[in-house]
């Protein structure tokens, strides 16, 4: 059985109404070729030319014209707060850790090594479960494969 294929992504704000939705974790939103299942239990094949980072609210454009909205899944995260949030953000970024930056808190994926480091420099930490939509890379949309130092 041939699956409907997606070879194009429509970014948030550049499409109107979804025919279905697929819920993906942050890590699963970085893909090139993968079989996915929608919330309505319909399978489709993502077959993109390049590995792509999808954001909450982007849409998979299927070849038959349907749009499948990408929803950020709830994930096990660590909420980071403290009197000097800028300093905490610097330490997180210095370790190339994906970080969701909000006005009064930072969110990162749970990692005991980073958690220990943040505790030692005065962060207040709390485990939470919610969607993870970290900042994209400075050199392009979404994630990159890193850079050399």
UniProtKB/Swiss-Prot annotation:
Query: Which Gene3D superfamilies is this protein grouped with?
Result: Urease metallochaperone UreE, N-terminal domain, UreE, C-terminal domain
Top-rank taxon = Bacteria
State the GO CC annotations.
cytoplasm
UniProt key word Cytoplasm: yes
SUPFAM superfamilies documented for this protein: Urease metallochaperone UreE, C-terminal domain, Urease metallochaperone UreE, N-terminal domain
Compartments, record wording = Cytoplasm
The record's section on Pfam families has: UreE_C, UreE_N
Provide the GO MF annotations for this entry: nickel cation binding; unfolded protein binding
- GO process annotations (BP): protein folding; protein-containing complex assembly; urea metabolic process
Give the UniProt keywords, A-Z: Chaperone, Cytoplasm, Nickel, Nickel insertion
HAMAP family tied to this protein: UreE (MF_00822)
| Family statement drawn from the similarity comment of this UniProt entry | Belongs to the UreE family.
Which NCBIfam families does this entry report, sorted A to Z? PRK13261.2-4
Relate the protein's function as given in its record. Answer: Involved in urease metallocenter assembly. Binds nickel. Probably functions as a nickel donor during metallocenter assembly.
Q: What is this protein called?
A: Urease accessory protein UreE
Native organism: Ruegeria pomeroyi (strain ATCC 700808 / DSM 15171 / DSS-3) (Silicibacter pomeroyi)
Higher taxonomy: Bacteria, Pseudomonadati, Pseudomonadota, Alphaproteobacteria, Rhodobacterales
Q: Report which gene this protein is encoded by.
A: ureE
